[in-house]
Amino acid sequence: MKDLSLRNVSFSYPGGFLAVDDVSIDIKGGENVAIVGQNGAGKTTTVKMINGLLAPTSGSIFMQQNPIGAESKKHISYLPDHTYLNMNERVRDIIRYFSDFYEDFDEKRAYDMLGKLQIDASDRLKTMSKGTKEKVQLILVMSRHADLYILDEPIAGVDPAARDFILNIILSNYEPEASILISTHLIADIENILDEVIFIDHGQIRLTASVDDIRMNNGKSVDALFREVYRC
């Protein structure tokens, strides 16, 4: 994976609202990292900047020392927090579109995951539940041979009983040397797959630490520390 670096990144929306304030992050190849925080903390804005959908108001973002741009997008597979797919399309047609658009898209991997999740490729998205639609979108993202997978709230719309299975699908279907960056507020469900966690609040980094260090130095789980920091 190409190392990712954010340096003193800030972003303000029209009207002057400061959503991200002087954020610096480093993610190395092969790491599974979560940006955690409550709703409105700045998680989605941060991942949109990393994916090149928003341009920082100030600061810089690099992949392997190259500025984020058209070239970096070839190496990033991004799951947004809202679906962007055509609800009238059948799953198999969407897979074909992705295969035509992305050189690194693996159709076999996509169909394997559909089978494991018992999703019929002939079904139209509009006939599916919200959770199943999100599973389809996740399958599309994880079927690329990318360097960085950015997942914005990947299990928020999934039934709690299915979350472990979804996480297993994620971990079983990404490139071994790639990194995964997950934006979430559901810490307990993903803690065991993480190497590092970044706490963000009101657009600022409150803490960056490895999961092992948090457990060793604080004597508690990441989820317990999250609840303490955010008093939830």
Task: Describe the predicted segments one by one.
Residues 4-6, 20:
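Conserved structural motif at the start of ABC-family nucleotide-binding domains
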Residues 59-72:
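Conserved ABC transporter NBD signature motif
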Residues 36-38:
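The feature captures the beta-strand-to-loop junction immediately N-terminal to the Walker
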Residues 149-153, 158:
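Catalytic Walker B motif of ABC-type/P-loop ATPase nucleotide-binding domains
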Residues 163-176:
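Helical segment within the ABC ATPase nucleotide-binding domain
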Residues 81-137:
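ABC-family P-loop ATPase nucleotide-binding domains
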Residues 51:
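Helix-to-loop junction immediately C-terminal to a conserved catalytic motif
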